[in-house]
Structure formats: structure tokens, C-alpha cells
């Protein structure tokens, strides 16, 4: 087993903190941070900000200048070895005279997948991997799932009362949770490559399903400038072609993909609206594969009980995020999700609680499927 020093951990943690700064802007690329250290001092550091812009290693090398020669590089993901929008980072480290590279994890991207480490090794540079691997995985869980399985990382968001209700019997649901929880939802949307909902939700609430910087938590506004705002793709299941160009969805100039089993005439819709056509059978799984092909890393789901239950039933939910408000709505109010195929308690899906956080008066619970 490889042994790393406490100093190695400190510098890699700094690289991870830098990588996290790119979580709102890098999609479809991974979020990566890099720290260059010489004689125990940081001589250069940086993170990848946006696709097409310099990678983290290049930013750190530019800051270090001549001091990069003889330095150790701490990078949160294996340096790339291929020519894309930017030159290979492994080559940049070699040319700068870096003598050692420590990577938090190997890159599963088939274009990299060990090739970066091999390029470094072939050049005589000592390279090791798997320092603070779990933290590195968490930062890029969407990118990593897409690389490994060809599908996005699916986060299902639900908001409910203490008695597990999401809306009154009439459908009234604004607002179950408080302003702080809704602000947190804006933050989660901002991290996502795409949002998934249904025409039923759109018709009932006429939501914009966009990211609103003014509603961000105050601490996020200081690190994520308004001019950097990136709107996620809105993916809407619309089997009966009920979505119309007058919906608020289309007031935000960001792609809208309408999903159904039959084509429709999009006359009158803005040019950023398009259709995705699938047969009804296995529509959700086929949609996930298609979203993976379209480089969607993380999919944030805001929908009603039907789609929520269908995603859970199909085992497509990677993370279940529940906001619980300190309210009681009674047994006539609407339930959390529909699971019509579930008839035995022994068959109920089990979930592992990973995080519990108080947000204002509400509680945020984050679960992952147990045993997966």
C-alpha cells in the first residue's frame, strides 16, 4: 500500500478545495484542482474553470513559472494525455520540469485512463495515485458515472412535510419549505448539467426551472459571480405534447429538450427547443443513455410523485435529497412518490443516510441506495 505523508494530505486537500470552485462551471468537463509545491512551499496553484479554458495544471504552471522546475504536482485527477480543446496536461508538466506527480485518482475517461500516468512515467517522472480518493470521487460523481456507465448521476429532489406529504389535496404546494431551503435548491440546480421534470409539473406550476443567482445563499454569491451563471438544460417528459411556447420555461434562453414517443411540430417554439424521441418501452433508461451521450454529467430531478416513483422503481436514482419542513398536512394531502409495483414491505427499497443538515427551519437529508 502506498504511504503518503501528512504534508501530502495537506497539499492534496488544498487541490481538492480548488477543484470544488469549478463545480458550477466546468460541465461537461470534470472539476480539477492542482497545487505545485517546491521546498515545502506552494509555488503555483489553479483550478479548471470552464470547458475550452486552461486545465488546472496549466493554470498552476503559469503561476509558478520557472519555479515549476523541480516541483511536485498535487492534482485531483490524473493529468490528461490527449489533445482536445487544450494540449495534454501531462506533457505540460513534463516540459516544465516537474519531478513528481501525485494524483488523487485515475481518470476513467477512455481518452486518459492511465495514459497520463504512463506518459509521466515514461518521461522519468515519479507518479503515484489514490491520495484522498474518496473526496476526489465526490467532487466529480457526475462526470465519473458518465465515463463509467454512460449515464448521468441522477439526484432526485423531494420536499415534504413531517408526515411525508408534498402538497395539499388541491395540489397547492407553494411553499412547503422555507426560503433557505429554496435557496439551497438554487445552489443544487447551479451544479447540475440538466434538470428533469414533466409536462404535468410545468402545467401545474408554470416554473422557469432555471438558476436564479439572486436567490443563491449569500456565501455562494461571493465565490460564484453573477456573470459566470450557467443555465442547465431543461429536460421535460411530454408524452402528450402539452408543453406550449407560452410557458415560462422559454423565458430563459437555455436549451429545452422535450421528450416523447412521437414527433410534434415545433412551429412557434424558440430555436433552443428540440425534441428527443423514444419508444415508450424503457423510455427512462433510454433517456439516461441519451443524456450521457449528450455529455450530461449530473441530472437534477424536480417532479411529482409519478416520475419520482418511476425513477426509484427503475433503480435510476443515485442520490435522494429530501427537504423536510416542520409542518403537518394531514392524510388527505398528496404523498411523496408512487410505487405501484411495491406490494411487500420486504421489497421496499432501502437507503443509506449520508448527510443531515439543518437549513433554516428545514432539514435536508441526502441518501444513496443501500447495497449498491
UniProtKB/Swiss-Prot annotation:
GO annotation terms (biological process): riboflavin biosynthetic process
Purpose: Converts 2,5-diamino-6-(ribosylamino)-4(3h)-pyrimidinone 5'-phosphate into 5-amino-6-(ribosylamino)-2,4(1h,3h)-pyrimidinedione 5'-phosphate.
Residue ranges of the region described as Reductase: 151-372
Name of this chain's protein: Riboflavin biosynthesis protein RibD
GO molecular-function terms, A-Z: 5-amino-6-(5-phosphoribosylamino)uracil reductase activity; diaminohydroxyphosphoribosylaminopyrimidine deaminase activity; NADP binding; zinc ion binding
Top-rank taxon, per record: Bacteria
All copies of domain CMP/dCMP-type deaminase, residue ranges: 6-128
Cofactor remark: Binds 1 zinc ion.
Catalytic residue positions: 57 (proton donor)
Region listing for Deaminase, in residue ranges: 1-150
Phylogenetic classification of the source organism: Bacteria, Pseudomonadati, Pseudomonadota, Gammaproteobacteria, Pasteurellales
Pathway: Cofactor biosynthesis; riboflavin biosynthesis; 5-amino-6-(D-ribitylamino)uracil from GTP: step 2/4; Cofactor biosynthesis; riboflavin biosynthesis; 5-amino-6-(D-ribitylamino)uracil from GTP: step 3/4
Residues holding substrate: 173, 189, 209, 212, 302
Residues that bind Zn(2+): 55, 80, 89
Entries under PROSITE patterns matching the protein: CYT_DCMP_DEAMINASES_1 (PS00903), CYT_DCMP_DEAMINASES_2 (PS51747)
Co-factor(s): Zn(2+)
Entry-linked InterPro entries: APOBEC/CMP_deaminase_Zn-bd, CMP_dCMP_dom, Cytidine_deaminase-like, DHFR-like_dom_sf, Eubact_RibD, RibD_C, RibDG_C, Riboflavin_Biosynth_HTPR
Family: In the N-terminal section; belongs to the cytidine and deoxycytidylate deaminase family. In the C-terminal section; belongs to the HTP reductase family.
Amino acid at each position: 500500500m502506498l504511504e503518503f505523508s501528512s504534508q501530502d494530505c495537506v497539499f492534496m486537500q488544498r487541490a481538492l478545495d480548488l477543484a470544488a470552485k469549478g463545480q458550477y462551471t466546468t460541465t461537461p468537463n470534470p472539476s480539477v484542482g492542482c497545487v505545485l509545491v517546491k521546498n515545502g512551499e506552494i509555488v503555483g496553484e489553479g483550478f479548471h474553470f470552464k470547458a475550452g479554458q486552461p486545465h488546472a495544471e496549466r493554470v498552476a504552471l503559469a503561476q509558478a513559472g520557472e519555479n515549476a522546475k523541480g516541483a511536485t504536482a498535487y492534482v485531483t485527477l490524473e493529468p490528461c494525455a490527449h489533445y482536445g480543446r487544450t494540449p495534454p496536461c501531462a506533457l505540460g508538466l513534463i516540459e516544465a520540469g516537474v519531478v513528481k506527480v501525485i494524483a488523487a485518482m485515475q481518470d476513467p475517461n477512455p481518452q486518459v485512463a492511465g495514459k497520463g500516468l504512463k506518459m509521466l512515467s515514461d518521461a522519468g517522472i515519479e507518479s503515484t495515485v489514490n491520495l484522498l480518493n474518496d473526496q476526489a470521487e465526490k467532487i466529480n460523481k457526475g462526470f465519473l458515472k458518465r465515463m463509467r456507465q454512460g449515464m448521468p448521476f441522477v439526484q432526485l429532489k423531494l420536499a415534504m412535510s413531517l408526515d411525508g406529504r408534498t402538497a395539499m389535496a388541491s395540489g397547492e404546494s407553494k411553499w412547503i419549505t422555507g426560503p433557505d431551503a429554496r435557496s439551497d435548491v438554487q445552489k443544487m440546480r447551479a451544479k447540475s448539467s440538466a434538470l428533469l421534470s414533466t409536462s404535468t409539473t410545468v402545467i401545474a406550476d408554470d416554473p422557469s426551472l432555471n438558476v436564479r443567482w439572486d436567490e443563491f445563499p449569500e456565501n455562494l454569491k461571493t465565490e460564484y459571480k453573477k456573470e459566470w451563471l450557467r443555465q442547465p438544460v431543461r429536460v421535460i417528459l411530454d408524452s402528450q405534447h402539452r408543453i406550449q411556447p407560452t410557458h415560462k420555461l422559454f423565458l430563459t434562453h437555455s436549451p429545452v429538450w422535450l421528450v416523447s414517443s412521437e414527433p410534434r411540430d415545433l412551429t412557434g417554439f424558440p430555436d433552443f427547443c428540440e425534441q428527443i424521441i423514444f419508444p415508450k418501452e424503457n423510455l427512462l433508461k433510454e433517456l439516461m443513455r441519451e443524456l450521457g451521450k449528450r455529455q450530461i454529467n449530473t441530472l437534477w430531478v424536480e417532479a411529482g410523485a409519478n416520475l419520482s416513483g418511476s425513477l426509484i422503481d427503475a433503480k435510476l436514482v443515485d442520490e435522494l435529497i429530501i427537504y423536510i419542513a416542520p409542518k403537518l398536512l394531514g392524510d388527505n394531502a398528496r404523498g411523496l412518490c408512487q410505487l405501484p409495483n411495491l406490494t411487500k414491505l420486504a421489497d421496499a427499497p432501502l437507503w443509506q443516510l449520508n448527510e443531515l443538515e439543518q437549513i433554516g427551519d428545514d432539514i435536508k437529508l441526502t441518501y444513496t441506495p443501500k447495497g449498491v
